[in-house]
A protein has these predicted regions:
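Conserved glycine-rich cofactor-binding loop
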Residues: 11-12
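Conserved glycine-rich Rossmann-like NAD(P)H-binding loop of the short-chain dehydrogenase/reductase
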Residues: 23-43
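Conserved NAD(P)H cofactor-binding loop of Rossmann-fold oxidoreductase domains
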Residues: 85-90
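Substrate-binding pocket helix/loop in short-chain dehydrogenase/reductase
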Residues: 93-103
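Active-site helix of classical SDR
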Residues: 117, 151
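Residue(s) in the substrate-gating loop at a strand-loop-helix junction
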Residues: 135
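C-terminal helical subdomain
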Residues: 175, 196-233
Length: 255
């Protein structure tokens, strides 16, 4: 039985950083890299010295998830690590976002993540790990990013409760909640009229991933990198959410 790691959103951004650093935290025979863009996956495979198996799949489609499910049933690998890094957001007034994009966020950010967790768990043993990527937006409601923020709140809640359930089997679940991070995420998220005008700070994905792997090894439940991100996490616990939303709208000069 071969030991594998599975990672979605593997072709760029944090997903790529997580993939390239897998050997520093865990030993596996093969890495299953899942992303939409086949050319980027192939380039990643050629550039790295890792044993990568690529899958060009659109996780919005149920058929893509079924392909993974069928492959797991066929090969029955030992999954040492699952990283759900695929996801996207749209920053715009809700009524200006297409229904397709709004539902798409829920499908990729929540439904695909949940499906992959539930499909992978039967092939996991003691000391296996799941890393799910959420966001600091998970800590409070965020106008003009509301579907995205809500989808990440789901990831945080689902992951923390799943981690408690799986702790008896020795399977650890970590939720990573990044602040603004320098990735291609914004190429798709930001509308032409740029509703979000001010980014307090942009963190490097390398630092976010490094902190996440350290927190995984320490068996923490939530990983938040950076002073500002941690401050936001604390303030969102202490302050009324209506007040937090007002601060956000004032910062972005939104009504």
């Amino acid at each position: 039985m071969k030991n594998i790691a599975i990672i979605t959103g593997a072709s760029s951004g944090m997903g790529k950083e997580f993939l390239l650093n897998i050997p520093s935290v865990i030993k596996v025979d093969e890495i299953w890299a899942i992303a939409r863009e086949k050319s980027l996956l192939e380039s990643l495979k050629e550039e790295s010295n890792l044993n990568i198996r690529t899958f060009s799949l659109d996780l919005e489609k149920e058929s893509s998830l079924m392909k993974i499910k069928d492959l797991l049933e066929e090969e029955k690998p030992n999954i040492k690590l699952l990283i759900n890094a695929a996801g996207f957001g749209k920053f715009e007034k809700s009524t200006n976002i297409s229904l397709e994009d709004s539902i798409g966020m829920i499908k990729v950010n929540d439904m695909a993540l949940t499906s992959l967790c539930l499909m992978a768990i039967p092939y996991m043993k003691k000391n296996s790990n799941i890393i799910n990527i959420a966001s600091v937006a998970a800590f409070q409601p965020v106008p003009y990013i509301n579907v995205y923020a809500a989808s990440k709140a789901y990831v945080l809640s689902f992951s923390r409760s799943l981690g408690r359930e799986l702790s008896k089997e020795g399977i650890h679940v970590l939720t990573v909640c990044p602040f603004w991070t320098k990735t291609k995420f914004f190429n798709r998220a930001v509308a032409k009229n740029k509703v979000i005008k001010k980014y307090v700070v942009m963190y490097d994905p390398t630092d976010v991933v490094k902190k996440a792997y350290i927190d995984m090894q320490k068996e923490k439940n939530v990983s938040v990198y950076g002073f500002i991100a941690n401050a936001q996490k604390v303030l969102c616990k202490l302050l009324p959410h209506n007040f937090v939303m007002s601060i956000w709208c004032k910062q972005q000069k939104l009504k």
